[in-house]
């Protein structure tokens, strides 16, 4: 019953904002044209909620859907309750999760998605759909009450996955950082999503979308 599209990033190579995702989203939301998307802008640290909402509305105008940010509601959960689809944008995962807790959205999002409401998210919005945010790439610039995330997907997500070390970088590679996580959490699975890829989860099955496959690390 669950139907989710977890996108690694909002851009791929030289494409515009969310441009590479449009064909995927058109297919994913084919039965929802004219319906309402509740958009969660909490991860967007460097822009206002109004600005983030407008950016996403413009980028996804070809979907023919009404995109409304949760901050438009008297209570943010009001917009979630009324929506046909839920979307969470990218940015800082710690800020995102903190505000999901502050506005009491964890349970209502989980309930709606478990009952069949389509969910899509990119970057932080993909990361927070997993079991916890412990495999985010972001700096902990604020502290949520828990690292436990929406748990719509029972495993870990690592968006923006890059294999190997960049030239001149002497710190740990992404594989090494994720290997550290798995040493401390040996029963976990990490789904690493390279740029330009997505994971479609439907009826308990996960399918790759995009030119690059995801990696499952354990």
Swiss-Prot record:
It comes from the Bacteria. Coiled coil: none annotated. It catalyses: Dipeptidase E catalyzes the hydrolysis of dipeptides Asp-|-Xaa. It does not act on peptides with N-terminal Glu, Asn or Gln, nor does it cleave isoaspartyl peptides. One of its GO terms (cellular component) is cytoplasm. One of its GO terms (biological process) is proteolysis. One of its GO terms (molecular function) is dipeptidase activity. The active site is at residues 123, 138, 160. It is an enzyme of class 3 (hydrolase). Gene3D superfamilies: 3.40.50.880. Keywords: Cytoplasm, Dipeptidase, Hydrolase, Protease, Serine protease. It is found in: Cytoplasm. SUPFAM superfamilies: Class I glutamine amidotransferase-like (SSF52317). Its EC number is 3.4.13.21. Hydrolyzes dipeptides containing N-terminal aspartate residues. May play a role in allowing the cell to use peptide aspartate to spare carbon otherwise required for the synthesis of the aspartate family of amino acids. PANTHER family: ALPHA-ASPARTYL DIPEPTIDASE, PROTEASE S51 ALPHA-ASPARTYL DIPEPTIDASE. Belongs to the peptidase S51 family. This is Peptidase E. It comes from Haemophilus influenzae (strain ATCC 51907 / DSM 11121 / KW20 / Rd).
């Amino acid at each position: 019953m669950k139907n989710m599209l977890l996108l690694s990033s909002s851009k791929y190579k030289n494409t515009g904002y969310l441009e590479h995702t449009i064909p995927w989203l058109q297919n994913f939301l084919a039965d929802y044209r004219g319906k309402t998307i509740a958009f969660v802008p909490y991860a967007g640290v460097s822009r206002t909620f109004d600005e983030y909402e407008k950016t996403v509305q413009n980028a996804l105008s070809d979907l023919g859907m009404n995109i409304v940010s949760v901050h438009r509601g008297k209570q943010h959960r009001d917009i979630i309750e009324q929506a046909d689809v839920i979307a969470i944008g990218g940015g800082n995962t710690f800020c995102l999760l903190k505000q999901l807790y502050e506005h009491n959205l964890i349970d209502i999002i989980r309930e709606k998605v478990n009952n069949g409401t389509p969910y899509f998210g990119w970057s932080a919005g993909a990361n927070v759909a997993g079991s916890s945010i412990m495999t985010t790439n972001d700096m902990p610039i604020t502290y949520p009450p828990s690292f436990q995330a929406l748990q719509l997907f029972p495993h870990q997500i690592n968006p923006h996955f890059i294999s190997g070390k960049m030239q001149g970088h002497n710190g740990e590679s992404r594989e090494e950082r994720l290997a550290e996580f798995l040493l401390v959490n040996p029963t976990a699975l990490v789904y690493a999503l390279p740029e330009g890829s997505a994971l479609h989860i439907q009826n308990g099955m996960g399918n790759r979308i995009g030119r690059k496959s995801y990696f499952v690390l354990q």
